[in-house]
A protein has these predicted regions:
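Short, well-ordered coil/turn segments that N-cap beta-strands
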Residues: 1-3, 26-28, 59-64, 97-100, ...
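Acidic/histidine-rich catalytic cores of soluble enzymes
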Residues: 30, 36, 66, 132-231
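Glycine-rich, proline-tolerant flexible connector loops at the mouths of alpha/beta enzymes
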Residues: 32-54, 106-113
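Short, acidic/polar
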Residues: 11-22, 82-91, 188-199
């Protein structure tokens, strides 16, 4: 199993200390958000020297996803152009850091979250047209772009994500699968179908899986326990990975590093049972 964690979930300061702790915990991959792991970095602060320094401090810890979580659905054209430039800067980092992909979600359409607004064709086309120049620039730089679906955002289903990938029409467009991103209190019975659909439609584009979990408490509200302590069907995920020959990093999200080893022990036990 290719094990990883988000850098900002590691209780250390500085990329070197974070990478050393990741290795100490038995992992080899990081999801790196530079703003959250490199002290003092702000958008616009790219330099080749900084990128090379980060690469050296990571050592043999590999970057699964370089996070650039912009909002391609921003209301104004000016805001969207600003988001594009932020992402392009991360692509310049990626040319040196060599992650599997630079990743983003897609935001919600309009001033407040609304399923009705998110599911309009106008919302979809805004995301598509914002991502086109990003994908083209990434292709020039030899970098992959990965898109992550979220139930409350414009790209909110595996089928919609497949449409976006096909419409962008480039081989460097990939997908991140975070099963819990699709969970709502009223759709937990559909999660197995969402897992199966994701692998059926996107197995050829998946670059990373986010590991967390969900459960419903006695009051009927969603809670988020550590991986394999809730209701998410990890057995089905591993069965699909085997079926479709998907061998990609599994990245803990929102799990402190001191609980990483126990989390992966549980996942390994499930995987070994299939």
């Amino acid at each position: 199993m290719k094990k990883g964690i988000r850098g900002h979930d590691v209780r250390e300061v500085g990329v070197k200390a974070i990478s050393e702790k990741i290795k100490e915990r038995g992992m080899g991959y990081i999801q790196l958000v530079i703003e959250r792991s490199v002290a003092g970095f702000k958008p616009g602060g790219f330099s080749e020297e900084l990128a090379e320094s980060i690469k050296a401090e990571l050592g043999d810890v590999k970057i699964a996803i370089l996070g650039s979580y912009i909002n391609p659905s921003a209301e104004s054209e000016e805001a969207r152009l600003g988001e594009i430039e932020k992402f392009k800067e991360k692509i310049r980092f990626a040319r040196i850091l060599e992650p599997l992909a630079v990743g983003t979600e897609t935001g919600f359409f309009g001033p407040t979250q609304s399923d009705e607004a998110n599911n309009t064709e106008e919302a979809y086309l805004r995301v598509l047209n914002t991502l086109r120049p990003i994908v083209a620039y990434a292709k020039e730089m030899g970098v992959n772009v990965a898109i992550e679906g979220v139930s409350i955002f414009v790209i909110n289903s595996p089928r919609k994500l497949r449409r976006l990938i096909d419409d962008l029409g480039e081989d460097n467009v990939k997908a991140i699968f975070d099963p819990v991103n699709y969970v709502r209190a009223n759709n937990t019975d559909k999660m197995d179908a969402i897992i199966n659909e994701t692998f059926e439609l996107l197995s050829d584009r998946l670059v990373a899986i986010h590991a967390k979990d969900f459960a419903i408490n006695p009051e009927g509200k969603l809670i988020y326990p550590d991986p394999a302590l809730g209701e998410l069907n990890y057995k089905l995920i591993f069965e699909n990975m085997k079926k479709y020959s998907v061998d990609i990093p599994i990245i803990l999200e929102g799990i402190p590093d001191d609980r990483a080893e126990a989390s992966f022990d549980r996942l390994e036990n499930i995987k070994s049972s299939i």
